[in-house]
Amino acid sequence: MSFSPASSEPHDAPAAAGSSVPASRSIAERWKMEAAPIRARLLLRAFAWLFSLLALVVMATDVHGRGGAQDFSTYPEYNYCLGMSIIALLYATAQLVRDAHRLSSGRDLVAGRKAAAVVDFAGDQVVAYSLISGLSAAAPVTDYMRQATDNLFNDSAAAAISLAFFAFLAISLSALISGYNLSLEAIV
């Protein structure tokens, strides 16, 4: 039981006899509070999916001219960034399907709450670090090429790197929520 600073009455105290106002929060209010991190994580993963898809499309279509210096596949750093965007897209897709199933049916596809919390946290961490690794490999190449010339190829590469960064932000914020959920599972 916890006490309110304004009064000495506990929050979980039963309602007074004959009173229609309960002293504790209702079950619906508690359910809404417990579901807020789940909905926030679902929204963040949807953003990660969108930004990963856009980064993948922009990078994969960054072919200006007939090969040579203006083709993303010429640069291993861009291929690495593209690969990390693909991994993030696949991970976000799997997690979105899993979260949607969890919200609709009330059951998780991963057996055990603690195992599911570990999968969420570890997966978010690995994918977030992979994304930041991919975009940090591609950013210096784009910066170096922009010093020589500023063209559509460099602008498209910079846009893809920025979108990968936004996907990283969404997944890393999702990792914070997953870490919070994992800490609750470790306590319970």
From Swiss-Prot:
Residue spans, topological domain Cytoplasmic: 1-42, 98-114, 178-188
Glycosylation site list: 154
Keyword Iron on entry: no
TM region(s), chain numbering: 43-63, 77-97, 115-135, 157-177
Signal sequence region: none
InterPro entries in the record: CASP_dom (IPR006702)
Keyword annotations: Cell membrane, Glycoprotein, Membrane, Transmembrane, Transmembrane helix
Protein's membrane topology: Multi-pass membrane protein
This protein's GO CC annotations: plasma membrane
Primary location: membrane
Protein family per UniProt: Belongs to the Casparian strip membrane proteins (CASP) family.
Name of this chain's protein: CASP-like protein 4B3
